[in-house]
Curated annotation (Swiss-Prot):
Subunit relationships: Part of the ribosomal stalk of the 50S ribosomal subunit. The N-terminus interacts with L11 and the large rRNA to form the base of the stalk. The C-terminus forms an elongated spine to which L12 dimers bind in a sequential fashion forming a multimeric L10(L12)X complex.
GO biological process, one term: translation
Gene Ontology CC entries for this record: ribonucleoprotein complex; ribosome
Lineage: Bacteria, Pseudomonadati, Pseudomonadota, Betaproteobacteria, Rhodocyclales
GO molecular function: large ribosomal subunit rRNA binding
Provenance organism: Aromatoleum aromaticum (strain DSM 19018 / LMG 30748 / EbN1) (Azoarcus sp. (strain EbN1))
Assigned keywords, A-Z: Ribonucleoprotein, Ribosomal protein, RNA-binding, rRNA-binding
Family recorded in the similarity comment: Belongs to the universal ribosomal protein uL10 family.
Protein name in UniProt: Large ribosomal subunit protein uL10
Function: Forms part of the ribosomal stalk, playing a central role in the interaction of the ribosome with GTP-bound translation factors.
PANTHER family in the cross-refs: 39S RIBOSOMAL PROTEIN L10, MITOCHONDRIAL
Length: 166
């Protein structure tokens, strides 16, 4: 049974709210995927903070009209699942990682920072480390000289203690 007009308006409003806060939209064709696999994908998306949903393409076109994602409208053909996220790489990463293990999920397109991405662009976006990973790397780089300096001071103090004891 199809959606009535009120249901369609509610879906467009819900997707519009997600898109308003989003930095990235990733789109994939899901034809032939088992329900259990799709449920697993949804669970991974929830863990990553990605809004993942199968939607009617016409409703998505209405929701993304007059947004930075409007260029994606031409790519919305066929049975698609949409990943929408505030994190710049999360949606692309969730769909790309799942597509690596399941050949029935085919990445189609995406949009980031007002640019429409093809399949290769979505895969490239997915390969970028997340913000948390980048911050952890930066912290490690900043912490390394301090740690080295502390080890040097400790070794120097130990050497002086040995000289005094001798």
């Amino acid at each position: 049974m199809g959606l009535n007009l009120d249901d369609k308006k509610a879906v467009v409003a819900e997707v519009s709210a997600q898109v308003a806060n989003a930095q990235t939209i990733a789109v994939a064709e899901y034809r032939g995927i088992a329900v259990g696999d799709l449920t697993g994908l949804r669970a991974k998306a929830r863990e990553s903070g990605v809004y993942l949903r199968v939607l009617k393409n016409t409703l998505v076109r209405r929701a993304i009209a007059e947004t930075p994602f409007a260029g994606l409208s031409d790519q919305l053909v066929g049975p698609l699942i949409y990943g929408i996220s505030e994190d710049p790489v999360a949606a692309a990463k969730v769909l790309n990682d799942f597509a690596k293990g399941n050949d029935k999920l085919v990445l189609k397109a995406g949009s980031y920072a007002g640019n429409t991405l093809d399949k290769a662009g979505v895969q490239a976006l997915a390969s970028i480390p997340s913000r948390e990973e980048l911050l952890a790397r930066l912290l490690g780089v900043m912490q390394a000289p301090v740690t080295g300096f502390a080890c040097t001071l400790a070794a120097l103090a130990k050497k002086r203690e040995e000289e005094v004891a001798a």
